[in-house]
């Protein structure tokens, strides 16, 4: 029986490239000349540091535009609400969503069941496996999940026939 997995993951190479491009843009921007600002990436967390809270927000915008240029969905970003003030600098932590949380996975399973498409879906850790008899049914589920607005992008992999 044909099946596929619904996953939500960020390509780490593209993420690293976007951070490097953001650093380059930061060094060439006129409004950051002479300012103490930096962008650092470590363990799926990007730390944005600047002298002012407003500049931290600008760094988030720079990172968001570079992510979209590298085809990394900006909706995977989880930005801290308030910047942390330590000494003379402000810092923001940006985390990236990896995997599908259980409540979102349950929403996907419920959405697939409510659609009356003849497939079975089950939660397997941070992925959702969808199995059906016809390939067309699986493609209909893919279209359904793409159209749903669940707050994070999904990829489909491990397609077996």
Swiss-Prot record:
GO molecular function: nucleotide binding
Taxonomic superkingdom: Bacteria
Keywords, ordered alphabetically: Nucleotide-binding
UniProt keyword Transit peptide present: no
Record-level GO cellular component terms: cytosol
Pfam families assigned: DUF520 (PF04461)
InterPro entries: DUF520 (IPR007551), UPF0234-like_C (IPR035571), UPF0234_N (IPR035570), YajQ-like_sf (IPR036183)
Function: Nucleotide-binding protein.
Family: Belongs to the YajQ family.
Name of protein: Nucleotide-binding protein Shewmr4_3156
Organism encoding this protein: Shewanella sp. (strain MR-4)
């Amino acid at each position: 029986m044909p099946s596929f997995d619904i996953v939500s993951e960020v390509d780490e190479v593209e993420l690293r490239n976007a951070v490097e491009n953001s650093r380059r843009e930061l060094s060439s921007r006129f409004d950051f000349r002479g300012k103490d600002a930096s962008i650092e990436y470590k363990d799926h967390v990007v730390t944005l540091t600047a002298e002012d809270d407003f500049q931290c927000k600008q760094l988030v915008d720079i990172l968001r535009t570079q992510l979209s240029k590298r085809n990394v969905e900006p909706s995977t970003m989880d930005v801290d609400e308030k910047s942390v003030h330590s000494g003379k600098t402000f810092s923001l932590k940006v985390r990236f969503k990896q995997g599908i949380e259980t409540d979102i996975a349950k929403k996907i399973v419920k959405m697939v069941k409510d659609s009356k498409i003849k497939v079975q879906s089950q939660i397997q850790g941070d992925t959702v496996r969808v199995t059906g008899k016809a390939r067309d049914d699986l493609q209909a589920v893919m279209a359904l999940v793409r159209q749903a607005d669940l707050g994070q992008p999904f990829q489909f992999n491990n397609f077996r026939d």
